[in-house]
């Protein structure tokens, strides 16, 4: 996929995304730590859940169980009492079982490879990549809903039922500057959540607006002033109401 993107375009994309993030990136508590346990908790809780709802649960869970060993020792019912109000109730069990498995490892050392991380319950390619980037500072592609949408729109990839497979994963890896996966993946998640939204995308303030394939190619309604935006969205641009993952 890297060979399909001109080097100049890729570098411009990286620069604009990182410059935007330096000013507009979200300040989230799990971005102030490199503890793989805390990062795993944040990713599991954030699955298909808005950040505003995740924050109090994340803070409460770590207040009660500040380490992976503390979570492993806790009764499952106590863990689920904290996590279940978010919905998707299996994640409390996932976290508890993952903690038990980590605690059983020699020295209780947290997994440090993609393969080891993906052996934990509830941990797929995305979550394993997040821990690799944010805890271990090792470049790995990350595709959540927002990043997938941003990359698909900007580089003109077709939307498919399996949009996070194949070409998109290769593209997500190709846009990472060497040694900067930690920061650009956070930047892409924020840009997708706050600007390149599924509905009413804020194209007019997007740092990538001049190079976005979907914005450039979007047809204008007959007789209307051209205000290009990613198809199929038709909403007027507006300030973000709340950040979404």
What are these regions (language model features)?
Residues 233-236:
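Charge-dense, helix-prone N-terminal extensions
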């Amino acid at each position: 996929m890297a060979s399909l993107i001109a080097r100049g375009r890729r570098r411009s994309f990286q620069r604009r995304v990182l410059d935007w993030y330096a000013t507009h990136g979200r300040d989230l508590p799990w971005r102030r730590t490199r503890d793989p346990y805390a990062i795993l908790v944040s990713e599991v809780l954030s699955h298909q859940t808005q950040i505003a709802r995740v924050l109090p649960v994340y803070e409460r869970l770590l207040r009660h169980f500040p380490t992976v060993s503390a979570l492993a020792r806790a009764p499952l019912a106590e863990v689920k009492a904290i996590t279940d109000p978010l919905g998707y109730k299996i994640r409390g069990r996932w976290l508890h079982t993952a903690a038990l498995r980590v605690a059983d490892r020699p020295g209780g050392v947290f997994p440090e490879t993609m393969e080891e991380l993906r052996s934990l319950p509830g941990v797929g390619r995305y979550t394993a990549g997040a821990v690799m980037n944010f805890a271990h500072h090792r470049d790995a592609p990350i595709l959540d809903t927002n990043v997938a949408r941003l990359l698909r729109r900007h580089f003109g990839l077709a939307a498919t039922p399996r949009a996070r497979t194949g070409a998109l994963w290769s593209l997500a890896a190709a846009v990472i500057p060497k040694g900067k996966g930690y920061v650009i993946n956070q930047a892409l998640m924020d840009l997708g959540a706050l600007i390149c939204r599924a509905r009413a995308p804020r194209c007019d303030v997007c740092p990538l607006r001049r190079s976005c394939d979907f914005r450039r190619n979007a047809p204008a309604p007959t007789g209307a002033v051209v205000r290009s935006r990613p198809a199929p969205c038709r909403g007027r641009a507006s300030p973000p109401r709340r950040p979404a993952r």
